């Protein structure tokens, strides 16, 4: 059960709780400078923290609307207390505290959420009384704090904390805290176009029939990826080796895989082709290749049972297609753009220039780069989604927003997903109001269907996902 209570007096409120414990799982525009050789941002996005003082106790506070708050309105949030211990938890109090000074920048937001920064000055805005919680039990309360108790807040991102303290004298000392944020908009919110990589790592060169059967089964990872993006404005970045693996099998291809491919190509989403096997174009440009590696001859992939026979684990360039070979369209994806590259990691200006000619027949391309490739982005600032490097047009994926949405996409648990979305919203505040932000989800073979859908739609503004927006 979930109890819903409106706080009726400032600072000291009693909220009725469900009589029985609920046992559930809880997880919780700027001018562009030339890219600089800074390290790639590889640390996970900070999420609202749940810090227990003893093993087994977790506290989560998740403001509604992904943390978005209108000054003067009631603050509504979900408060979850989970007791993973084998003994019951005594009654206590959850103190709600709000910082009145907005966090200065993204780094300050990240440090607050991940617990690496000391708490700033916080003011109490309410107390929630908790009852005894059984071992391995979870209680969940909808909290409503009147706007008068929250107070007026100027646009900004504000630290919000919940602290649990045991009340009963003589009971084991128990405490925990949860850090989160309130986001007060400064104008029209930024909208996010999210690029979703559709990939699957094979054990060999190409996915085998056995692997495809598992991946495209009702509970398979590739099925979950299509389920997650269906009906959303996601931009799809598809590894053509998946398509090739299905087509080279011919009549030996699993029926579920054939149906999956048909479904993929029927989706209305904008999509582009990754390099074959998601090969990294940065490394190829660094090696001085004037054209990207490609697989033009699929004959080596055809074995007696329709499985790959070549031991070569990486794409190899060929100059001609031998007679009798499978046509080069084997890896073609219906409706996919071929003028977009998504290199991994950081790049140099020279590499961007080289990759700008990696299109078909030496045609032009546009690379998607992480914002950390740029001076401002490396310092934690927001960077415009469009720009140029040395005369080459580029798209820029916001690294902080991408990391937070990637964390959300990986979560099947609503509480954990909600925390990641609050982080994304807090980071988005620092983008220009009304701007379009590009986010690129991390490459991952498995994602939660619910998490992926939520990550794509949470900040899309209901608009179509297109790279030319």
Where are these regions (language model features)?
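Secretory targeting and sorting signals
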Residues: 1-41
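Proline/serine/threonine-rich low-complexity linkers at boundaries of modular beta-sandwich domains
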Residues: 44-59
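Asparagine-centered strand-capping/turn motif at beta-strand->loop junctions
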Residues: 81-88
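Catalytic grooves of carbohydrate-active enzymes
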Residues: 82, 227-228, 234, 320-469
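Short aromatic-acidic-glycine turn motif
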Residues: 97-121
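Short glycine/proline/serine/threonine-rich loop/turn segments at secondary-structure transition edges
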Residues: 149-160
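Active-site beta->alpha N-cap acidic-glycine motif
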Residues: 178-266, 270-273
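Metal-dependent polysaccharide deacetylase catalytic core of the NodB/CE4 family, i.e.
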Residues: 230-345, 349-351, 358, 392, ...
């Amino acid at each position: 059960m979930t109890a819903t209570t409106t706080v009726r007096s400032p600072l000291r409120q009693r909220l009725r709780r469900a009589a029985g414990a609920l046992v559930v799982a809880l997880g919780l525009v700027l001018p562009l400078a030339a890219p600089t050789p800074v390290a790639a941002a590889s640390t996970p996005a900070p999420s609202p923290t749940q810090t227990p003082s003893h093993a087994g106790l977790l506290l989560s506070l998740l403001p509604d609307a992904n943390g978005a708050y209108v000054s003067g309105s009631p603050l509504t949030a979900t408060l979850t207390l989970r007791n993973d211990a084998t003994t019951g938890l005594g009654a206590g109090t959850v103190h709600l505290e709000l910082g009145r000074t907005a966090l200065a920048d993204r780094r300050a937001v990240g440090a607050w959420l991940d617990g690496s920064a000391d708490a700033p000055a916080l003011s109490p805005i309410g107390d929630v009384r908790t009852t005894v919680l059984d071992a391995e039990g979870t209680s969940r309360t909808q909290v409503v704090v009147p706007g008068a108790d929250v107070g007026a807040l100027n646009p900004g991102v504000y630290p919000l904390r919940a602290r649990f303290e045991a009340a009963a004298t003589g009971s084991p000392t128990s405490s925990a805290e949860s850090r989160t944020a309130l986001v007060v908009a400064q104008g029209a919110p930024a909208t996010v176009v999210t690029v979703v990589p559709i990939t699957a790592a094979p054990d060999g060169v190409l996915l085998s029939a056995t692997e495809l059967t598992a991946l495209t089964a009702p509970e398979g990872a590739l099925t979950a990826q299509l389920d997650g993006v269906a009906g959303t404005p996601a931009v799809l970045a598809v590894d053509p080796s998946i398509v090739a693996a299905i087509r080279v099998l011919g009549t030996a291809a699993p029926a579920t895989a054939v149906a999956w491919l048909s479904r993929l190509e029927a989706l209305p989403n904008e999509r582009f082709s990754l390099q074959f096997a998601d090969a990294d174009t940065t490394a190829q440009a660094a090696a001085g290749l004037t054209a990207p590696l490609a697989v033009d001859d699929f004959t080596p992939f055809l074995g007696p049972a329709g499985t790959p026979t070549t031991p070569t684990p990486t794409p190899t360039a060929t100059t001609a297609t031998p007679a009798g070979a499978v046509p080069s369209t084997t890896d073609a994806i219906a409706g996919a753009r071929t003028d977009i590259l998504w290199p991994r990691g950081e790049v140099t200006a020279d590499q961007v220039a080289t990759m700008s000619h990696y299109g078909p027949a030496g045609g032009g391309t546009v690379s998607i780069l992480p914002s950390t490739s740029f001076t401002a982005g490396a310092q934690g600032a927001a960077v415009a989604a469009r720009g140029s490097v040395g005369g080459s047009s580029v798209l820029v994926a916001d690294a902080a927003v991408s990391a937070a949405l990637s964390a959300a996409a990986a979560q099947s648990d609503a509480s954990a997903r909600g925390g990641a979305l609050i982080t994304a919203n807090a980071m988005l505040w620092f983008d220009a109001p009304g701007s379009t932000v590009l986010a690129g989800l991390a490459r991952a073979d498995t994602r939660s269907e619910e998490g992926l859908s939520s990550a794509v739609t949470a900040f899309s503004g209901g608009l179509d996902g297109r790279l030319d927006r």
